[in-house]
């Protein structure tokens, strides 16, 4: 089978009415799956359905009550949800429009042309165009293709992975990456103040200022998720339930719903909130805050009738030069014991990947003991 035939887009375009078994989710997951468009309509029509908090952070730039209220609203959302719709983010609409147009134009190219940027996970090369980032605990595949690469700092990026077509892709991605880096600093300041810490605390801990001689910048990884139409959205997912390893994740989309977050024991469909972007708290921030801020469990659903694209920027600490551990001030005066052992970001990613692989092996062993064959 060729790489082109392996792409989910090719499978979708083939007109299949059923999906291959490797995409069918385990039975215990299927009860609350469904078409993303239909679930979003149902959520919009139900006033009793829980709603992801919306916070306008432009008030943070002012003195007085508005600034304090902004800090408190972001803190509450990060503690109770681990996800926020951010308004007043300062990302110009024309830049976001150009970014969306460039991503859509890339995925509109023939698959064979996109293959020029293909990754090779087996060889340890995760960046580029592909269809799967890592092993899944379920052993199942996800209904998505993607483009993944470092977008900041620009001097560390492998620009051979940045599409030359459309021509707008490189300049708008570079512009967007720089702007999100500024936004990340602002949010980390707000989140620090929400914990009663100096506003530079969380960014300092993520960049390594507390280690002698270390002052690395945060890394921003851009992943464009492409979820083709799926004939059985009740059986498949675009991205399975997971938490992000990052400190923060910034998300925008093409207007097609699909994001769900787990809150208070239920899956909550993200509603359209015009003018906002979604921000997730990730594992790195949960570790630094000793669990005060929650790394949100989330997943991506698919639809029969619509193609969904989302642009996700993962804001990460340097992989090896920063030690992630709870901020000492949050443990002072008997406030609590550390919930997380110290680790570098690279070690955390490796531990999480190992756990996924072990979970998959355990699932396969259980299936084999029941007379089932798994691949």
From Swiss-Prot:
Gene3D superfamilies: B-lactam Antibiotic, Isopenicillin N Synthase, Chain
GO biological process annotation, one example: anthocyanin-containing compound biosynthetic process
Pathway: Pigment biosynthesis; anthocyanin biosynthesis
Catalysed reactions listed for this entry: a (2R,3S,4S)-leucoanthocyanidin + 2-oxoglutarate + O2 = a 4-H-anthocyanidin with a 3-hydroxy group + succinate + CO2 + 2 H2O
Family annotation (Pfam families): 2OG-FeII_Oxy, DIOX_N
Residues annotated as domain Fe2OG dioxygenase: 218-317
Protein task: Involved in anthocyanin and protoanthocyanidin biosynthesis by catalyzing the oxidation of leucoanthocyanidins into anthocyanidins. Is able to synthesize anthocyanin pigments from leucoanthocyanidins in aleurone tissue. Converts dihydroquercetin to quercetin in vitro.
Protein name, entry field: Leucoanthocyanidin dioxygenase 1
Organism: Oryza sativa subsp. indica
Gene: ANS1
